[in-house]
């Protein structure tokens, strides 16, 4: 991800997550310890009460992404997430609603162990999401490094007008 930061030195990194604010310090620790570029965290409020007006994680991510598009109308975005929740659908929606604003989409494919989590069975499985069809190039891989191996050459070519 630092290579993306090097390619686009004036572009900010936004970390948009469905995680609640009470885990902010853990996420910041992860970002720092793994050498990710600095950037603001956009997390969601946690409300333990059932059926409240606080948006779901998926709705939170879509609303924040749309707000970023509105706040930075001249900025283009690279969207990176995973297939464990609704990132593919959310990112395809953003790409369709804001044509020409999304340069690329990266989706990390979760491993079977990540999908089953601590449950260790299909009963505890989090359904992975396929990537909907979009006009934006989509790069997939099981790690961020895998995604970058194919995404970076594309971004370089796009940056050079090739």
Place the predicted regions along the sequence by residue:
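C-terminal cap/substrate-recognition subdomain and adjoining C-terminal extension
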Residues: 11, 19-162
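Glycine- and small hydrophobic-enriched segments that form the cores of compact globular domains
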Residues: 1-19
